[in-house]
């Protein structure tokens, strides 16, 4: 494992912890898209089914279990424990417009036409667009809490670091996964506008807002 993969994993973990702490400490999920969190839970569930079929390392298994557990914990907090604070009126992105095309694409473009491989491919494609409901929600409300922007920043940083990880692996290991790279590029592009606003506003103590 190279330093970019490790820091990417740590950034991803930081994003998840920030979100959970934000919801738990404020006793509110206001400003958080439950639909994005449902999509992320679906991503981790379909990606890590290999937990039942293979073992790579203790680190690998531990991280997979943490991602799955945290994603469902987040969904539970949003839709059950703090349901009264969930802003469903603004969380209106039509997720079927993401899930259905991604499902079709995973059947058409994959490494191997087997159930686990198709589900893994589905998870890669879906993760690249799973943040769209959250960004759409911010654009509808016109702003985001600072702690929410920190969550989004670390989530975007994780994906950007993974892109560097793939470049590193290509040059030093000869490894190249076109599906993962293309999906990662798409996901990073979706964060570009947010990164700009984060640097120019949030880091200067201003509130973040996206163009409506």
UniProtKB/Swiss-Prot annotation:
Q: Which residues lie on this side of the membrane: Cytoplasmic?
A: 25-32, 80-92, 136-149, 200-212
User: Where, subcellularly, is it found?
Assistant: Endoplasmic reticulum membrane; Golgi apparatus membrane; Cytoplasmic vesicle, COPI-coated vesicle membrane
InterPro entries, A to Z = ER_ret_rcpt (IPR000133)
Q: Which organism is it from?
A: Bos taurus
Q: Which PROSITE patterns match?
A: ER_LUMEN_RECEPTOR_1 (PS00951), ER_LUMEN_RECEPTOR_2 (PS00952)
Which residues are exposed on the Lumenal face of the membrane? 1-4, 53-58, 111-116, 169-178
Region named Important for recycling of cargo proteins with the sequence motif K-D-E-L from the Golgi to the endoplasmic reticulum: 204-207
Q: Which family does it belong to?
A: Belongs to the ERD2 family.
- Bilayer disposition of the protein: Multi-pass membrane protein
Identify the gene encoding this protein.
Answer: KDELR2
Q: Which residues cross the membrane?
A: 5-24, 33-52, 59-79, 93-110, 117-135, 150-168, 179-199
Enumerate the residues marked as the site Important for recycling of cargo proteins with the sequence motif K-D-E-L from the Golgi to the endoplasmic reticulum: 193
The UniProt GO MF terms for this protein read: ER retention sequence binding; KDEL sequence binding
UniProt keyword list? Cytoplasmic vesicle, Endoplasmic reticulum, ER-Golgi transport, Golgi apparatus, Membrane, Protein transport, Receptor, Transmembrane, Transmembrane helix, Transport
Task: Tell me which Pfam families the record gives.
Answer: ER_lumen_recept
- Could you name the domain of life of the organism this protein comes from? Eukaryota
Entry protein name: ER lumen protein-retaining receptor 2
